[in-house]
Amino acid sequence: MAIIINIDVMLAKRKMSVTELSERVGITMANLSILKNGKAKAIRLSTLEAICKALECQPGDILEYRSDEDTGFVKKKYEGSTEK
């Protein structure tokens, strides 16, 4: 399972730069990059709220769920490991 954060689409719609979003939300460019690139393991609700406020959007506008099949992960039933 993967939750994807699609910030780029909303940035383009709002004609806002990553730098401007970073300043408005109060997070570093590095952390914003982690969110954008799908490397984040979690996001605080307060951060999500700040992003939505800055982009004038709803959480559903930037969050997307993808199943394991969509992301290419296969779980081994008996071994408990994952392969890609």
Swiss-Prot record:
The keyword Magnesium does not apply. SUPFAM superfamilies: lambda repressor-like DNA-binding domains. InterPro entries: Cro/C1-type_HTH, Lambda_DNA-bd_dom_sf. Residues 7-62 form the HTH cro/C1-type domain. Residues 18-37 bind DNA. Signal peptide: none annotated. Keywords: DNA-binding, Transcription, Transcription regulation. GO terms for molecular function: DNA binding. PANTHER family: DNA-BINDING PROTEIN, DNA-BINDING PROTEIN-RELATED. This is Uncharacterized HTH-type transcriptional regulator YozG. The lineage of its organism: Bacteria, Bacillati, Bacillota, Bacilli, Bacillales.
